[in-house]
Each structure stands twice: as structure tokens, then as C-alpha cells.
Amino acid sequence: MSPWQPLLLALLAFGCSSAAPYQRQPTFVVFPKDLKTSNLTDTQLAEAYLYRYGYTRAAQMMGEKQSLRPALLMLQKQLSLPQTGELDSQTLKAIRTPRCGVPDVGRFQTFKGLKWDHHNITYWIQNYSEDLPRDMIDDAFARAFAVWGEVAPLTFTRVYGPEADIVIQFGVAEHGDGYPFDGKDGLLAHAFPPGAGVQGDAHFDDDELWSLGKGVVIPTYYGNSNGAPCHFPFTFEGRSYSACTTDGRNDGTPWCSTTADYDKDGKFGFCPSERLYTEHGNGEGKPCVFPFIFEGRSYSACTTKGRSDGYRWCATTANYDQDKLYGFCPTRVDATVVGGNSAGELCVFPFVFLGKQYSSCTSDGRRDGRLWCATTSNFDTDKKWGFCPDQGYSLFLVAAHEFGHALGLDHSSVPEALMYPLYSYLEGFPLNKDDIDGIQYLYGRGSKPDPRPPATTTTEPQPTAPPTMCPTIPPTAYPTVGPTVGPTGAPSPGPTSSPSPGPTGAPSPGPTAPPTAGSSEASTESLSPADNPCNVDVFDAIAEIQGALHFFKDGWYWKFLNHRGSPLQGPFLTARTWPALPATLDSAFEDPQTKRVFFFSGRQMWVYTGKTVLGPRSLDKLGLGPEVTHVSGLLPRRLGKALLFSKGRVWRFDLKSQKVDPQSVIRVDKEFSGVPWNSHDIFQYQDKAYFCHGKFFWRVSFQNEVNKVDHEVNQVDDVGYVTYDLLQCP
């Protein structure tokens, strides 16, 4: 296997237990978007596994009937199993165990010739999972690096920019490196060996449940436990609970015990809930008010009505139509499903399945015995479901394993080694002598090197305008009454720590307040939400983001999906979706691989990864001199590159290092014949390049589809109106 292929941490979660009987005989159903591999026979599973990990030739999977015995013997030797050559119970158990997705090798191994040429390694946490609080994720990664720093002369410094040696990213499905994740319990994580570009980076599948290895981590608020996390399971009035509950209370506020036995210890806290606080919006973090009025209708729970992005929200007064005050409802991680076809939704109890009512998660209907729930009240009619939270995977252990790969280590055949390909949870110091021998073979022994300043900042960038999230000052009064008392009033509002960034935009109709971020640069002629984009002569910027064409103008934007019958969405406040941005933009661009979104205004650039922003950064940092006053647009190329345009010139731009090649600058007409040299919006849409000037666009089809804009001049194939032909205005 080429060392340039990423190391895929694959979870083959095919349980061997059968579902509990529903009637006399268990009834099994096909769940929408479920893993098909769960229906494989043992032999089919073994054949697929042996082929995937290099033990059999591709010809055997093409229909040639050959014995599996030689391949099984190799597998058993590699995994230190009894070498029977048979598909016995121990071998099947190993096949069903979480593991990395690369062919296995012998005792401690390193990627030949691949190691860092310096011992002061930098890393950047590009984005976060919502499964754990950010400080816990930061701590898990720091501890994972420290494992290797304890036994080798290596230091690890966290930085806040893409110049880092190791870029850490959470992603789902196709996340930008050409090696997509496949949802819950498939590929768990992967990393690349040392080197430039994507080499050395570590990616984690955000469809998994990340924990400390012992179940979901739920921080608590108020109560009498000083913010200690929930302890699952816990006992209350003799009954065991594996999630937050409202039992024992008459105000509907979910709570949990922070020890194993509430009946004995009496320690508790309140779980994240809209009854305690809301996130973002314009309600100043106040809790939801139920019921509330929206568009003349009464709501007694959080809703997604009026939104196109699926985020749950509520009013923070009794009447949204009158007061226009709202916030977003906190996520209930303990009750949020993973996988299935409703990832991120909440379990709905009770729900109906095969005519029977369920008030808790069940394994009925499944051959693998895994717990699941419906996310609507009736699975039989809606077919919406997901897996209930399980113990999750230790982010610390998986990260320590992946960072071993990022430092140059391959897999070990020693079962006790951290670099052994099969995942297992363990406590204490995770390194085995085999791991230590491997890392010291690469980097030697001895004390840590003297620290040297990294090439990028080691302090987290601060927002350029006051944040819009709710205040972090604790309330003056904390409820300390235990859950059995059942007070009639809700706990005092206000979380004790900053909430994570929230969703975008306001419920329809949108708030009338101007943007609160970047307000110093806002246009003096603010666009009215009622204005029709078909009346806009020239847009500030146009870009394809998340499959939708975005049209920006004076701090607002519209979204257009090119689907038959799909309505134009918006207007939305730009500052609600991307709070750090100014009101006026010059251009925007989404990296098709990493899904990072680049924004340009004047001589500044912002880069959004999900809800995390880097910037503003000066164009000087990109290698562009003062003569470049703005960026007109970017077009993607292969291998993490793009073309960057300004004033009739074009540069080659590296999307990871965020640097232009100063030797690459040429005139636009050398690559694109017939387009306006002074185009103000340049973007790619549906694999074609668009150059806009005034009300018109010039569309270019690439002549060289393999290398896009290499070697051949690309010709204009259409000229049209932005509003009539792109926005499809009447």
C-alpha cells in the first residue's frame, strides 16, 4: 500500500446478538439507510474483510472459488490469534471489532522515509464535534499528543491557522480529502503520514458518538454539583436511568444525577434545556417561553417552523409575532440519535413500531441487537429513526492512535499496543513497549527539544465585533432544590459557560434589527428584507455554497437551489450566518474538498470552517502586494489548488497554506478568452465558470476537463443576464 493513502480507522460493527422477540418469533425489518453489511453471512463478511485488508486477491472477489484458508492463516498470524485457518469464533470476533482500514504489517512499523524533519510539531483544531464540550475536546487532543511527547523528544504546540503541521478536522461523508466517511459505525477516523499539504492531518468522523469512552458527556447547570457532568447510568427511586429525565419534577426541566446513585448521594444538576437558556438569536440567552405565538399559532415546544435549515428555535416572550424575540434550543446529546435517516434529531417517546407503543429505546426489529428509536411518534407511517446513544468512542484513545500515524508509525501486531489495528477501550497510560520502540526508532530518545516559535499564531483569534451569543455571567440565584421536590418554577435562566456557536438566520419573518457584527462597516443604505433580488442591478458577491447559489448584497443574501419548483430562499442577514463578516463583500468561495468558505472584502479575508472563523487576515499574508486592492473571485482546481482573480490578473492559490504562487500571475485572457478583464464576480457553478460584469455574465466551459484550466485557453459558450438566467426572474 502506498504510504500516501490515508489510514482509515474502520469500525465493523456487526453485532451477533438477535433482537428480543416481539411475538413468538422475532420480526426483522429493513430500516431505511441502514448498513447493508449487517445482512452478510459470516463467510461473506470474512471474504469482504480479507479483500479489504489485503489478504486475498481481487480475483477471488470476482467469482473465483478459492479456499479462504491461506488468507485466514495470514490474518490470524497478524492479529496474534490461534492459527487454525478456519473461520472460528475468535476470528469472527476480531473481524467484527473496530479497526484501521489499511493492510496489516508485522511488529512495530514506520512509514519508510516518512517522518517530520523537526521535533517541534504544531497542530490546529480546525473545527469541533458537538458531542463533547470544546474544552474537553481540546484536553483530549492535548493529552493524546502528550502520550508521545512523554517517550520521545517531541513537543506539540497548538496554533490557530492552516500552516500547522497537523490539521485536525471533524467531518462527515465526503469531507474533502477523497476518502469519504460512511456514517455511524463505519470508518471511524483516518490520518496521513508526515509531509506537506494534507500529509500529517487527522480526520474524525462526526457521525460517530465521541465521548471519553464511557457514554455521552452531558455538562450540568445549577443543582448542587458545581457543573459536574451527568453520570450514566444512575439510580433514582430504585430505577436506572441512562439519559436525562424529568421524572420527579413537575416543571418539565430535564435533570440527571452526577453520581451513580442519586438516592444515596443526592447530587444532581440540570441538563442543557431550552427551559434554562437559549443560544444566539436576539433573546439575550433567556429561556423559552411556552406556549408562544408564531404566525398566529400557539407552540408548546421548540419548533423548526419558519426555517429552511432545520434548527429548533423558540420565542423568549409569549408572542413572537409582536416582540420578534427568539433563541435557538440547546441540543439534547443524551437523546439525539446517530446514524439511521434522522441523525441529529431527538427520540420521540412514545412511538409506534409494528403497531406496538414504545416508551424507551428498543432493539426490536433488528438482527444485531442495537438500540434504536423513532424520531416521530409513528415509525410505521413515517419510517424516521436513528440509533440511541451508546458508550461512544474515546476521542483521546482514537486521537492518540491517529497521531501515531501522523508522526510516522504504522500498525503493530502486538495486541496490547496502542498502534494495534483493533480498537478497544482501556484506562491508564496507553503505550506499550512496542509503541515506544517505534516512536524512538523515528525520533530517538532524550529530553524534549527547546521550544521554537511556530510560524503562525499560538493564541486564539478574537472576534472583530461583540459576539451575539447569550451572556456568560452566572445568574444571581441558583436552584438547589432536588428533583423529588418538584418546584413549580423553572430554574433561573443563564448558562454558566459560553454556548457553542449556533445556527444561522432568524425564524421567518426575520428580525428587523441590523447586523450586530461588522456593524461599523455596514452600508448606510441597508437593504430591506422585503426587497426583491430581481430588482438588484449588481450583487456584491455570488458563490456556490453547500450546493446552493448565494447572492450577497449590502449585508443580506439569498439562496437559490437549481431544482425544478424550488423557491428562492431569503433574504437572510449575512451577519447572522457568518457573524465576523462586514456588510459588504467582494467575493466568496467554497473549497469543494474541505468545505471551508473563503470571504473577501477589500484587503481582508475570512475563512469559515463550519461555525469557526479564522480572520480577518490581510491579503499580505496571502502573498498579495498593496497593488491588489480586492479579490474578484476564485475558481477551484484539483489537488487543493484554486485560481485567484483581481483586476484582470490571475494567480495560482494553495487552499491549505493560503498562499499564492507569485511566479504564476498571468493576464486573465491568457486562460479565458472573451471574458471581461474587469469582471467583479467570478465563481464556479455546476462545473462551469462565470464572469460577471454589470447585469451580465459570461459563462465558460472548461476545454480541459481533466486539469480544468491547464494548458488550453477556455472559451465563452454563453452570455446572459444574472437575474433572468441565473436567478430565473420573470
UniProtKB/Swiss-Prot annotation:
Keywords: Calcium, Collagen degradation, Disulfide bond, Extracellular matrix, Glycoprotein, Hydrolase, Metal-binding, Metalloprotease, Protease, Repeat, Secreted, Signal, Zinc, Zymogen
Induction trigger: Up-regulated by ARHGEF4, SPATA13 and APC via the JNK signaling pathway in colorectal tumor cells.
Name of this protein: Matrix metalloproteinase-9
Protein modification: N- and O-glycosylated.
UniProt biased composition (Pro residues): 463-477, 490-514
Active site: E402
Needed cofactors: Zn(2+); Ca(2+)
GO CC terms: collagen-containing extracellular matrix; extracellular space
Binding site for Zn(2+) 2: C100, H401, H405, H411
Reactions catalysed: Cleavage of gelatin types I and V and collagen types IV and V
Occurrences of domain Fibronectin type-II (ranges): 225-273, 283-331, 342-390
Residues carrying a glycan: N39, N120, N127
CDD domains reported in the protein's UniProt record: FN2, HX, ZnMc_MMP
Keyword Protease among record annotations: yes
Stored SUPFAM superfamilies: Hemopexin-like domain (SSF50923), Kringle-like (SSF57440), Metalloproteases ('zincins'), catalytic domain (SSF55486), PGBD-like (SSF47090)
Subcellular location: Secreted, Extracellular space, Extracellular matrix
